[in-house]
Amino acid sequence: MRQGPHHDGSELYVSKDQPTLGEKVRLRVRVPSAYRFEIALVRSYHDGEPRFKELKQSSKTEFESWWEVDLELTNRVTRYRFLFARAESFEWLSARGLTNHDLHSNSDFQIVASDTRPSWLAASVFYQIFPDRFAKSSEKKLPEWAVARSWNELPRDKSKYTGIEVYGGDLDGVREHLDHIEELGANGIYFTPIFPATSNHRYDAASFDEVDPLLGGDKAWFRLTAAAKRRGIRIVGDITTNHVGANHKWFRKAQSKKSAAERNFFFWNRDFKWGYVGWWDLPSLPKLNFQSKELRRRLYAGKNSVIRKWLSSKYGLSGWRVDASNMAGVHKGDDFHDEVMHGIREALDASHDDAWLVAENGDFVASDLDGRGWHGTMNYQGFFRPFSIWMSDSVDLAGGFQGLPIKPPRIDGNQLVESITQFSASIPWHALTASMTLIDSHDTPRFRTIVSGDRSKHLSGIAFLMTYPGIPSIFMGDEIGLEGRSGEDSRRTIDWEDRSRWDLALLQSFKDLVKLRRTQDALIRGGLRWLDIGQDHLLFLRESKRQTLLILISRAAISLDFDLSSSGYRFEKTLFGPSQEGTRLRVNTGRATQGIWSLR
């Protein structure tokens, strides 16, 4: 793989982590000694007009030189790229890498002035819990809509029971098993919705005012948040801003009284036999109409709004995951998406000065991540989908493959890296590092099933999850090897009574990798530099001011002999995987392999 000049948004290359408008930042570029050029310039935009400024060499070794330039942030978002010119040829260095032709500015590096992020986020690993399936503290009487299931029965996938099978997991059950989460090493919990509803997933909220009594109600919530706080575990909630359930008190009032303010919260349309617009044309999920200022006030703008209430010290959330974020405020000729997104961010910042706002958007809209809205996204399209396709054994997964109505294609390592680079290049570095990375969730097949039950490939998945920039999220039960062929099937329970069914070797590896993610400086705040990409392997560096890590991820048997001496590195310590020393990485294995080493 050709090595050329490198720059990214991490601390090695940008002098200020959270600069303010009008400040100067120093940009640095690392250039290998073998790379030849006559002049290096930075092109940046000032009030929409491009300007050029020459870089100066600041240091040089046998292996590389460093070049730098100061840049004043005159606009809220500053886009820039570097030009390396020589006789009759040139190359641009943008967030997409090196190119020898002109390209659009949407792949420029970006710095967002006066943007803030939670102080605790960078060193966090989250554990996703689907409340009905994690742990049950006691038996409860079920409502009429629910179909009771025994704890260790498998979900009936895609059937008339979809959404109404109830296993009885609750918040006291979570509290009683916080030891498991803490021992795993996770310091954050992301809950799918906890509000009253008429489904097991609770994305059809009947109220945003209290916790579902089936989960133990507000009292169980307070017990859980207090216990989690004592352990240093933060909790992120899940909110539907695009729709509510047909039993939501706002919707019931709107139906019963045409003069009610709530009437304007929804779209009424006689083209549907039920008389209103539902999300995906589902009558169970009335879509919210953000033309209503009163809806905005109740949901996020008002002092006692839903968003603000649950972020208060009393209710204890440290952030929100926003469901179907790309659709909220958008309906035919209406497009209030940006207003809603910015309003939610303003409400979050006003009510909690250190909270995380992450959006579900399977199609990844880059403009949503410009510092005014979401801190990050659930990185489905820029991480999960290309990586899962690369790792997949083409098993027949239900419902297509994460938005693609086809079986998983076969791609090589270069296609994988090109895919994830396309998406990371379209957003600021700090939006990437504040995004949630995941190898599965409650809406996807389990990763263990994607790789046909192969433990070594599963381990490659968790190793990449813990070493790629972003905030890792582990779907409950992944750590013990749970499987599932679809989103519904993946929502399996954890058998707490019979641990002989757990993959204990995998669990220990999870713990080791989570610990590395939370303690190694280069994984917390380092940049990303690709060294070698093959059909079946990825080799890359994560580098901070204090540490350099080498990471190997393979999906199959590999034979690799890679010389580090040309870059001036040698092995210092093996942190995970096969032991290495000297200046050559030598790996010859008959299965998928992972390795993490510190270099000096």
Residue ranges and their predicted role:
Residues 132, 370-372, 376-381, 433-455, ...:
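Aromatic/acidic polysaccharide-binding cleft in carbohydrate-active enzymes
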Residues 31-33, 78, 125, 581-600:
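C-terminal beta-strand-rich structural cap/linker in extracellular carbohydrate-active enzymes
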Residues 40, 225-234, 242-264, 272, ...:
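Active-site-proximal helices and loops of the catalytic beta/alpha 8
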